[in-house]
């Protein structure tokens, strides 16, 4: 029985492709909250967050407006003297994707940013961390790659069509040029033949007139 349970747990671990951690915490003002994650080189780290502010009239938390509330996220490599590798400023809700370039402990810091009275308002931050292999890209990345691939295929198709049209135009130009040269050649030979006929005719007429004048004793 125990062996069966262990096998079931092991099978579940194999099925799950990534580690997911979801939680929320409360803060006030622009308090910076940091979390530590051990990431190996090539690990894909994804964070999803949503900030809500406390409404006294509703006596509950509500979504913060995008115009007057934002969230700043920093990722630092603690093993490299807190080297800053990500600095992202977003709206009250959003996501972040990071690919670890080195193995070691990383510090993920979340800091709400607000203006006016919201800077002192009670804030609830919902956070979800997902850690997986870089081979398991997120759906947005795959969709973007598919879109770009489709655009490249369309461009290649258009380029091929343009090349075919250019080849057709070159073939038509070559045909027209050959036809023009043939017409010009025929016209030139026709002129030459006409000149020859005219010269022969003139010569024959001159000779005939000479004989005529001799008979008439004009010459």
UniProtKB/Swiss-Prot annotation:
SMART domains for the chain: EMP24_GP25L (SM01190)
Miscellaneous notes: Present with 20700 molecules/cell in log phase SD medium.
Pfam families given in the database record: EMP24_GP25L
Subunit structure: Associates with EMP24, ERV25 and ERP2.
Similarity section: Belongs to the EMP24/GP25L family.
Its job: Involved in vesicular protein trafficking.
Entry keyword set: Endoplasmic reticulum, ER-Golgi transport, Membrane, Protein transport, Signal, Transmembrane, Transmembrane helix, Transport
Highest taxon, organism lineage: Eukaryota
Entry keyword annotation includes Signal: yes
Gene name in the database record: ERP1
Native source organism of the sequence: Saccharomyces cerevisiae (strain ATCC 204508 / S288c)
Subcellular location: Endoplasmic reticulum membrane
Residue spans crossing the bilayer: 187-207
This protein's name: Protein ERP1
Domain GOLD: 32-131
Principal place of residence: endoplasmic reticulum
